[in-house]
């Protein structure tokens, strides 16, 4: 694989004369001194797309969070979009949006700032978006199958939501299922396959019992909540320590996130969505990027991620926008330190940093001549990799100076 990429890079270099592909790409970016000036060109690029994916190079990019929040509010001026969030569970959103009643879910914790993962919701940089969602100005939904607020109430919620479920959870079954589920949420590595089999079987029995539920919307949402619980159970079954298991777990999660989005769009056919996630999950063909590291240089060939699933389900209706930076720093809001962002000298970001622009946008989807162009970029976690990026993302947003996320006191 490495030899093939080197050959492709050589062909790219020859076809571009003496100008490296990275500089060729960088020279085509529209430059902006203020980030808001880029929003109208982005709006034009995503026009008529039902799904807009907004990524981030890392989950600690404060300036990226800020710009994504501003961009969402700009694109949603006339309520054209709902926001679908990585880091928020499927059931959380159904309850928070009033589609299902809270029942046994503690109302003291029932808030978007608690239900959305703290990596984003507890930062100053997303505060305007969180406030807009909290006030009802922006509609939202959760797409994650990772443990979130409602998961801690899932078993009692299922029991309280429908009389059909009571018979499945009679006797000691409720306590046994609760105990196993708590350990699943805690990613307990001592869980046995028998215990996980028991959990999966009972969840499927609950699903079967819900066939008698007469409220079709409730039934549909609870059915998806069970799907999400089983998806995470599948990740726990694989484990989080072995290399192959971790990577198969990524595929399980991305497939379920895509199914959650697909369910939402099919359920509400008049709605469009903006998805908040990482560049990695937004990749439409991650296999076109060369991972190139041991122990598995061809790792990306094994992934089918959120963006790719959605492109297959909604062909031509997905625009995936990656965010990247040419300098500054990144850091989690809860950490005192930060890490400098220093683009590799062979990367597109290095070339962009020498153009001197504060912000930049490039609509890759309009450059069909770049489809097979191989160039180096740090789009995925600020790690410099070669690949056919125009097959992986539809657009790139460049930030000259990023900064760490900052905690907000609510």
Describe the predicted segments one by one.
Residues 16-410:
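Structured catalytic-domain cores with a bias toward divalent-metal coordination
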Residues 1-24:
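Bacterial Sec-dependent N-terminal signal peptides
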